[in-house]
């Protein structure tokens, strides 16, 4: 799911917003 993927990236980068 794109939402889960974006959330994982956001957590990995430690940013408040997802990185696409």
Curated annotation (Swiss-Prot):
EC number(s) recorded for this UniProt protein: 3.1.1.4
A molecular-function term among this protein's GO annotations: metal ion binding
SUBUNIT field: Heterotrimer of alpha, beta, and gamma chains; non-covalently linked.
Function, in words: Heterotrimer: Snake venom phospholipase A2 (PLA2) heterotrimer that acts as a potent presynaptic neurotoxin by blocking synaptic transmission and synaptic vesicle recycling. Enzymatic activity is essential for the neurotoxic effects. May act by binding in a calcium-dependent fashion to neurotonal pentraxin-1 (NPTX1) and neurotonal pentraxin-2 (NPTX2), but not to neuronal pentraxin receptor (NPTXR). Also binds to taipoxin-associated calcium binding protein 49 (RCN2), a protein localized in the lumen of endoplasmic reticulum. Monomer (alpha chain): Snake venom phospholipase A2 (PLA2) that possesses a low level of presynaptic activity and the same high enzymatic activity than the heterotrimer. PLA2 catalyzes the calcium-dependent hydrolysis of the 2-acyl groups in 3-sn-phosphoglycerides.
Signal peptide, first to last residue: none
Protein name (database record): Basic phospholipase A2 cannitoxin alpha chain
Keywords assigned by UniProt, alphabetized: Calcium, Disulfide bond, Hydrolase, Lipid degradation, Lipid metabolism, Metal-binding, Neurotoxin, Presynaptic neurotoxin, Secreted, Toxin
Cofactor(s) the record lists: Ca(2+)
A Gene Ontology term for the protein's cellular component: extracellular region
Stated family: Belongs to the phospholipase A2 family. Group I subfamily. D49 sub-subfamily.
Compartments, record wording: Secreted
Tissue and organ expression note: Expressed by the venom gland.
GO biological process: lipid catabolic process
Reaction(s) this enzyme catalyzes, per UniProt: a 1,2-diacyl-sn-glycero-3-phosphocholine + H2O = a 1-acyl-sn-glycero-3-phosphocholine + a fatty acid + H(+)
Bound cofactor: record note: Binds 1 Ca(2+) ion.
């Amino acid at each position: 799911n794109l939402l889960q993927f974006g959330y994982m990236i956001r957590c990995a980068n430690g940013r408040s917003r997802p990185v696409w």
